[in-house]
């Protein structure tokens, strides 16, 4: 069956409101809203079945967008299994594996879904009859902001409202006008946001896919240029028994997030935070001077780098076996994953274990403190600058021909839109396109998914492993992040003046934090907008850095202009509500009337008096209420109140 292109009138923005009350053992949808694009006729149903039947009765395929399908989708899957008599469109193979049935081969009253093993929900496809499906997409993957931020940034006519979620409600219960207004605004904000994106032709499943589609349209000449530049390296032989793509992928790492040794929990004073303007687009653009690998790799084996890899316009990747120790006054740049001997998140000062060369028994023989590194050419150059190396042996490698400026047309196009934007909406969309292309270049073949099976009136997920996804071009993906790490590390190094002197303290991918005034920040080009430059985003009079992605700065200036001082709290995994509670405890502004739970009250007050907290309380072990933990129960998912707990690194 040929898939029909959807009219925008066949696309709906949707939302559920679900029951939340004490000691509940089941949850249900008590209000379900939808609105078609280019309409303001919001329909609200009192239960999930009436909502679903509304779309079943339409004689056409429709697409529904929920903003955070991970939540609403649980209610849909539960109803498909237990209420509506639909069957999963998957086959159980004789070996126990599960295979997804293709869209065209789905039978009536069947469904399937796309949920990654990391728990990311993408879509649900429901075949209602031979000719019609209901497609359910997660708009959060295309527009990665909360509805509140989305409405504000895109300037939608409607804005998200506030409502108390807790209370005794049930399917088809009476609703107040305020409740109807709340859920109506939720779908109207989403509808307007989708209209803006679709009006510009941006209708892919995710923002990353949309970026790649746009880049390919700008780049491909229809004569094979795309395939010659970015072939599928997972279909090509590499070395060490791996495909070329698998071998090169070992060199791929994320951003440089590093807290200077000895600085954890220490209050520092009079500092500056500098941020790179669009780090990844900067590194991808030709103004950075960076060349990128294209085409096919040329592998070699042995302890050398061939002359062909060292001439101009080449980029190489290495598998190196070496011992290493950080040079005096240098910052670390080596991180080792999947090793029993080293923490996977730690940037290492030495390959030595407890300061000694060690040989330890391992499952595959002897493990030594001479380690195997898979690195880009860019990484290798920096490693040699930062470390003393010994027993170094190149095991194998590969090189590529290179091009400069291969991303320029794409980046220039969206940078111009962002720079000339007269409204926040246009600027926000341009920024999305600038910042989300690089990740698609590193996309792997991993297409593993979760498979849901009924269990105790609910369902449980099992991971099904698969590797049949079209990958990105990993040489570029790895080189982009490598160039970005080195850019940040060199800036941090220029401002590091020793452990006992003011200077670089902390970095997080595209920012450096130094206890130095702005005029003493060195080694960077400062400009508030230009690529490859740093913006002096804030100045602070005090700060404390605890671990990666966990710190507080008391900001006094933004963009070098004085502001009313405020605390900027960053703590990985800490939700906004927990930050609000911690902040009110630090400022002494807590009010009993604003406490939503007993835990809030106990955190903020003792014997009727406010509990005052300082930097000294911002340490591992700190527990702050305000975090919501999703728990699957019959009917769907509830969000249980729990604590954010600061863990040891």
Feature-to-residue mapping (PLM):
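Conserved acidic
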Residues: 6-7, 26-30, 36-64, 74-649
């Amino acid at each position: 069956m040929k898939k029909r292109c959807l009219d925008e009138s066949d696309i709906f923005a949707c939302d559920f409101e679900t029951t939340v009350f004490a000691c509940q053992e089941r949850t249900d949808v008590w209000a379900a809203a939808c609105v078609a694009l280019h309409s303001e006729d919001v329909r609200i149903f009192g239960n999930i079945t009436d909502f679903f039947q509304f779309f079943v009765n339409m004689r056409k395929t429709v697409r529904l967008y929920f903003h955070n399908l991970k939540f609403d989708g649980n209610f849909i899957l539960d109803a498909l299994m237990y209420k509506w008599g639909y069957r999963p469109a998957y086959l159980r193979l004789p070996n126990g594996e599960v295979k997804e049935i293709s869209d065209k081969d789905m039978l009536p009253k069947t469904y399937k879904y796309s949920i990654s093993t990391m728990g990311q929900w993408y879509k649900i496809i429901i075949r209602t009859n031979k000719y019609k499906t209901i497609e359910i997409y997660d708009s959060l993957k295309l527009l990665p902001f909360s509805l509140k931020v989305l409405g504000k940034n895109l300037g939608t006519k409607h804005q998200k409202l506030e409502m108390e979620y807790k209370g005794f409600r049930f399917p088809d219960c009476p609703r107040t006008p305020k409740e109807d207004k709340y859920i109506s605004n939720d779908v109207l904000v989403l509808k307007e946001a989708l209209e803006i994106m679709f009006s510009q032709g941006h209708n892919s499943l995710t923002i990353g896919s949309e970026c790649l589609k746009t880049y390919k349209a700008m780049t491909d000449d229809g004569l094979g240029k795309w395939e010659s530049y970015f072939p599928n390296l997972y279909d090509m032989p590499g070395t060490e028994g791996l495909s070329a793509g698998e071998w090169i992928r070992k060199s791929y790492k994320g951003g440089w997030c590093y807290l200077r040794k000895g600085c954890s929990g220490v209050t520092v004073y009079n500092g500056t935070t500098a941020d790179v303007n669009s780090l990844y687009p900067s590194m991808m653009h030709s103004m950075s001077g960076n060349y990128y690998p294209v085409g096919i790799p040329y592998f070699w084996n042995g302890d050398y780098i061939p002359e062909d890899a060292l001439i101009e316009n080449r980029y190489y990747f290495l598998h190196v076996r070496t011992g290493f120790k950080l040079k005096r006054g240098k910052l670390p740049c080596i991180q080792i994953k999947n090793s029993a001997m080293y923490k996977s998140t730690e940037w290492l000062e030495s390959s030595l274990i407890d300061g000694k060369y060690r040989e330890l028994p391992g499952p595959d023989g002897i493990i030594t403190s001479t380690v195997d590194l898979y690195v880009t050419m860019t990484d290798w150059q920096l490693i040699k600058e930062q470390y003393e190396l010994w027993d170094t042996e190149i095991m194998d490698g590969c090189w590529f021909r290179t091009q400069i400026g291969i991303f320029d047309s794409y980046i220039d196009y969206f940078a111009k839109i962002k720079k000339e934007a007269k409204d926040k909406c246009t600027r926000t969309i341009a920024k999305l396109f600038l910042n989300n292309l690089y990740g698609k270049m590193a996309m792997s073949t991993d297409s593993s998914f979760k498979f849901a099976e009924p269990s105790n009136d609910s369902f449980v997920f099992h991971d099904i492993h698969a590797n049949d996804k079209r990958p990105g071009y990993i040489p570029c993906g790895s080189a982009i992040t490598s160039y970005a790490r080195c850019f940040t590390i060199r800036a941090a190094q220029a401002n590091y003046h020793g452990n006992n002197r003011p200077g670089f303290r902390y970095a997080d991918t595209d920012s450096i934090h130094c206890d130095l005034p702005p005029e003493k920040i060195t080694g960077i080009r400062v400009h508030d907008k230009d690529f490859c430059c740093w913006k002096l985003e804030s100045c602070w009079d005090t700060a404390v850095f605890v671990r990666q992605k966990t710190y507080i700065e008391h900001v006094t200036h933004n963009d070098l202009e004085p502001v009313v001082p405020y605390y900027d709290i960053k703590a990985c995994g800490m939700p906004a509500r927990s930050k609000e509670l911690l902040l009110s405890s630090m400022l002494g502004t807590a009010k009993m009337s604003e406490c939503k739970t007993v835990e809030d009250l106990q955190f903020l007050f003792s014997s009727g008096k406010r509990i005052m907290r300082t930097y000294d309380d911002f340490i591992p072990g700190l527990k702050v209420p305000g975090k919501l933990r999703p728990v699957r129960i019959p009917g769907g998912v509830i969000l249980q109140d729990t604590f954010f707990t600061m863990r040891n690194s």
